[in-house]
A protein has these predicted regions:
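N-terminal membrane topogenesis motif
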Residues: 1-24, 57, 62-65, 69-80, ...
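Membrane-interface junctions at transmembrane-helix termini in multi-pass inner-membrane proteins
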Residues: 2-6, 63-72, 122-146, 163, ...
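Membrane-proximal transmembrane or re-entrant/amphipathic helices at the cytosolic face
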Residues: 395-399, 403-405, 412, 424-483
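Interhelical loop/hinge segments that connect adjacent transmembrane helices in multipass membrane
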Residues: 1, 5, 140, 183-228, ...
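Signature of the first transmembrane helix
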Residues: 3-58, 81, 85-99, 114-119, ...
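Helix-loop junctions and terminal segments of transmembrane helices
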Residues: 53-72, 134-135, 193, 245, ...
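Hydrophobic alpha-helical transmembrane segments
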Residues: 110-117, 145-191, 204, 208, ...
Length: 483
């Protein structure tokens, strides 16, 4: 891992957690200023707009990041495509707001979507510049932009809510966030990138984008299909239990994985343009991800009941076995979590679409079969789908990179041993905590601490890449702290 990637990861994690602190503070304030009904109105509208946002970007940001030879004509075409699609999707959102309000029997939906649609008018001027900062791996600038706009979002929402704007305060906060972000991007964009839109090169932009957005839509549907199946077969209470269990596991994605994936695409694209060793970068990145993810999911699998009871109360105990099974089933995904980014970064979005066209039907069939037995069977069945996805990604990456499966996944064998050491330490600590009948929080802290200690000892003993990176970071910090 080179210094550019390390720096990008530091700034990406810094932005993620700085914004998280701001969001938690604003959420706590808004929860006291707005009623559940007001927040509910905004949430429904935000969900609708989120789906539209997938269409709005149309893969143009990824196109700009991965394009090997980004000429002025291609950049002009990207601006033109962003404006054409963004404004069209915004217009469709405006036209759909009245039927949606009637379907939901909530007139406030008209106002909220009308305000949120302004984002679609602004974003086409911001998203290409943001993509270019990613392309050049300017994550320090991205940190400034994202954190500053998060502050504007939080302050706007709270101030408007205090002045009686109700659910509109959240909508206007979103627009303020987008507008401020666009202004910062105008000032901090890479030099020579503020160009008039053009149509030359539009075919390449839309060719890449059509594959990308189709793949994203299939992934979005597949990722949420289980809720409809569970609701139909087991009822809404089971949907709540399953969602609570899955939501706990998604905390890792939100706070760790997403920060890595934001850096992965530009890092792979940069290596691809320079003719670098992509198999080695993928193998090292995957080894690092699995060494962190597997001990975490092992911790959740072991301690799911205690975690659920501490965070949500005894009424959610039934979600604990579901959480355990999902945690185990998710583990194989971290062997290919960087796969979609690698395919995007090298321009092979068609291969990503082919994978989804195979994986999605398999996943749905597996869920439907498992739903004939129990909710726990459905949760455990996810491992079948994930192993199918793993085999597909390895197959396509082998042919694309000219590398063997051992080259791509070999370093992750050490991660399995690191995870085994960490989970063994956790299991021992958990058993001792339960025998001593320690309070839940103390038991979880001891078990988590034992897991971290086991991870560090095993990683150092096995000379895992994670240990090398941690030692490098430690020496760097000590050097900076020394006068």
């Amino acid at each position: 891992m080179n210094g550019k990637v390390r720096g990008a990861l530091v700034w990406s994690f810094a932005e993620r957690y700085a914004s998280l602190i701001v969001n938690i503070a604003s959420t706590m304030a808004l929860a006291r200023l707005l009623t559940p009904a007001q927040i509910g109105v905004y949430s429904v509208c935000a969900a609708f707009v989120t789906v539209a946002t997938v269409l709005r970007d149309f893969g143009i940001s990824e196109y700009l990041i991965q394009e090997k030879e980004l000429t002025d004509d291609k950049l002009r075409a990207a601006y033109a495509g962003a404006i054409a699609i963004g404004w069209s999707v915004g217009l469709l959102a405006l036209l759909a707001r009245h039927p949606l309000a009637q379907a939901l029997r909530e007139p406030g939906v008209v106002n909220v979507i009308g305000i949120l649609a302004l984002n679609f008018a602004i974003l086409p001027f911001a998203s290409p510049a943001f993509a270019l900062l990613n392309r050049h791996m300017e994550f320090r600038k991205i940190f400034i932009i994202q954190f500053s706009s998060s502050m504007v979002h939080a302050c706007t929402g709270v101030l408007l809510a205090m002045n009686g704007f109700g659910f509109r305060s959240l909508a206007w906060a979103s627009v303020a966030n987008t507008g401020f972000q666009a202004l910062l991007l105008l000032a901090m964009r890479p030099p020579g990138t503020l160009l008039l839109p053009g149509v030359k090169g539009m075919k390449q932009v839309f060719g890449y984008g059509s594959y990308f957005v189709t793949s994203r839509l299939i992934e979005t549907f597949t990722r949420n299909a289980h809720e409809f199946i569970i609701a139909r077969v087991f009822g809404l209470t089971s949907v709540g239990l399953f969602s609570r269990a899955l939501g706990l596991l998604e905390m890792f994605y939100t706070n760790v994985t997403s920060a890595v994936l934001r850096v992965a695409t530009p890092a792979f694209a940069d290596q691809h343009r320079q003719g670098g060793d992509l198999p080695a970068l993928y193998a090292q990145g995957t080894a690092m991800m699995t060494a962190i993810a597997w001990p975490f999911f092992g911790f959740v699998a072991l301690m799911s009941r205690d975690i659920m009871r501490l965070l949500f109360g005894a009424q959610w105990d039934a979600a604990a076995p579901i959480c355990t099974l999902l945690a185990l089933a998710i583990m194989p995904t971290y062997l290919y979590s960087l796969g979609p980014n690698l395919l995007n970064a090298t321009g092979h979005v068609a291969k990503r679409l082919r994978i989804n066209l195979i994986y999605s039907p398999v996943h749905l069939i597996v869920l439907l079969i498992a739903s004939r037995f129990s909710l726990e069977a459905l949760a455990g069945s996810w491992i079948v789908s994930h192993l199918v996805a793993l085999s597909l990604y390895v197959h396509y990456m082998r042919s694309l990179l000219g590398a063997t499966a051992r080259t791509l996944l070999g370093p992750s064998l050490k991660s399995a041993m690191v995870a085994a050491g960490s989970i063994a330490a956790q299991a021992l600590a958990a058993e001792l905590s339960h025998r001593a009948q320690l309070p839940l929080l103390i038991g979880l802290m001891l078990t988590g601490g034992a897991g971290i200690a086991g991870l560090l000892i095993a990683a150092q003993a096995l000379r895992h890449p994670l240990a090398q990176e941690l030692m490098r970071a430690f020496h760097h910090l000590r050097k900076r702290a020394t006068p």
